[in-house]
């Protein structure tokens, strides 16, 4: 009887210990599940941060490309304006040369006109001399008539030269007016281009400032990208470590569940044995 009582006491103690171990295992299992859930939350947070980091990286690259494109367009516009200014400068030089040649032709024509006028005056004087002469021999008259004829011919030639000079002068004046009109248009174009160049210069300064700022932002972006890359690597390492930790915890959970199941089976066996013992005692 004492042996049975001792056995019952031992079985009760073993049952109590099994219950305690089962409670401890359940508590440990709950803590493990909570730790697993926390690690999974941290892992999800790291994944979100990783996605945000990649988005920030893409935005930085996009802004940098936009700044570079604007700078290239500004450089192209400046080159086009410079080429246009050079072309107009060449045209102005050609117009100035044309004006100088026209002035030379005008000076030559004026000289010829003056010579023709002098010849006409001389012929007129000879004609008056002939009219005033009332006497003289026929030879003198013939000579004077010849001189008169020659004077008329010289006057006619002078008139022709004068008309040709006047015609050339008129053409020269038309050419000069056209050249002056082209020159005025060119000067207006130059003024307009100078104004545009001033605007472009201001834009260049603005772009240079923006470029400097963009360079600073680019340096900042590069620093940010390096920081984000390091953070990304750190996040990936932490995510990898978290995955390993989750895997280890999952194994621990599985082990604890197996151990809990074993303890429950032991508890059931002890309970069955106690029930059998009580039934045996009741039979006495």
UniProtKB/Swiss-Prot annotation:
Pfam families linked: Tropomyosin (PF00261)
Which terms does the record give in the GO molecular function aspect? protein homodimerization activity
Q: Where is the composition biased (Basic and acidic residues)?
A: 110-130
Q: Which residues form a coiled coil?
A: 1-273
Domain of life of the source: Eukaryota
Chain segments carrying region Disordered? 110-134
Annotated GO biological processes are: regulation of muscle contraction
Query: Which keywords does this Swiss-Prot/TrEMBL entry list?
Result: Allergen, Coiled coil, Muscle protein, Repeat
- Reproduce the free-text note on domains from the UniProt record: The molecule is in a coiled coil structure that is formed by 2 polypeptide chains. The sequence exhibits a prominent seven-residues periodicity.
Q: What does this protein do?
A: Tropomyosin, in association with the troponin complex, plays a central role in the calcium dependent regulation of muscle contraction.
Assembly, per entry: Homodimer.
Q: Which family does it belong to?
A: Belongs to the tropomyosin family.
Q: What is this protein called?
A: Tropomyosin
């Amino acid at each position: 009887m004492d042996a049975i009582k001792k056995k019952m006491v031992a079985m009760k103690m073993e049952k109590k210990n099994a219950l305690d171990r089962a409670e401890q295992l359940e508590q440990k299992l709950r803590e493990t599940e909570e730790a697993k859930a926390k690690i999974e939350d941290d892992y999800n947070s790291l994944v979100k941060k990783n996605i945000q980091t990649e988005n920030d990286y893409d935005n930085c690259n996009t802004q940098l490309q936009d700044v570079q494109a604007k700078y290239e367009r500004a450089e192209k516009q400046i080159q086009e304006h410079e080429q246009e200014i050079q072309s107009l400068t060449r045209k102005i030089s050609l117009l100035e040369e044309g004006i100088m040649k026209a002035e030379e032709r005008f000076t030559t024509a004026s000289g010829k006109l003056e010579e023709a006028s002098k010849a006409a005056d001389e012929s007129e004087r000879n004609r008056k001399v002939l009219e005033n002469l009332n006497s003289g021999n026929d030879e003198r008259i013939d000579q004077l008539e010849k001189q008169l004829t020659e004077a008329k011919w010289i006057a006619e030639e002078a008139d022709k030269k004068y008309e040709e000079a006047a015609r050339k002068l008129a053409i020269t004046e038309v050419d000069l007016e056209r050249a002056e009109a082209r020159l005025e248009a060119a000067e207006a174009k130059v003024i307009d281009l100078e104004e545009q160049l001033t605007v472009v210069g201001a834009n260049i300064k603005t772009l240079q400032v923006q470029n400097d700022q963009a360079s600073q932002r680019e340096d900042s972006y590069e620093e940010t990208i390096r920081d984000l890359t390091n953070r990304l690597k750190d996040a990936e390492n932490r995510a990898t470590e978290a995955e390993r930790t989750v895997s280890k915890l999952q194994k621990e959970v599985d082990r604890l569940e197996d151990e809990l199941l074993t303890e429950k089976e032991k508890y059931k066996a002890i309970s069955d044995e106690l029930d059998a013992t009580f039934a045996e005692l009741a039979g006495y």
